């Protein structure tokens, strides 16, 4: 890991079907945040489509093909990956949780206050790539 990787947070994982809440800093997005009370942290969940198992498998393939992604945990419909930046090695913690027709997501920077929209852009890029894979 790079110089600015930080420590892995202790609040990762799903508890009673819920991922950890975002802190007040703007460097986190989550599909389980209330979109009306906290729109700056809210991002829509990924669509699991008509076959959630196929979508989950596609998500895992997509992550495996992405540079600087380390899948740390993949069990029982929960996946946790670390994404690192190429230059300074900043690490973001990204979680995916299967929930029927949705895949809930949480993406948060370990260090700093602002992420300049990187976490939101990452989830939207994954959403776009999954949709493209599903249409093939």
What do the PLM-derived regions correspond to, one by one?
Residues 2-136:
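Ser/Thr-rich, low-complexity intrinsically disordered terminal regions
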């Amino acid at each position: 890991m790079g110089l600015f990787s930080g420590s892995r947070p202790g609040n990762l994982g799903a508890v009673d079907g819920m991922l950890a809440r975002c802190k007040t800093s703007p460097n986190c997005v989550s599909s389980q945040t209330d979109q009306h009370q906290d729109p700056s942290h809210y991002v829509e969940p990924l669509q699991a489509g008509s076959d959630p198992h196929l979508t989950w498998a596609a998500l895992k393939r997509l992550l495996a093909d992405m540079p600087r992604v380390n899948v740390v945990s993949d069990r029982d419909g929960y996946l946790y990956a670390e994404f690192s930046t190429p230059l300074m090695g900043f690490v973001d913690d990204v979680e995916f949780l299967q929930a029927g027709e949705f895949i809930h997501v949480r993406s948060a920077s370990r260090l700093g206050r602002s992420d300049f929209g990187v976490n939101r852009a990452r989830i939207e890029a994954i959403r776009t790539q999954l949709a493209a894979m599903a249409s093939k």
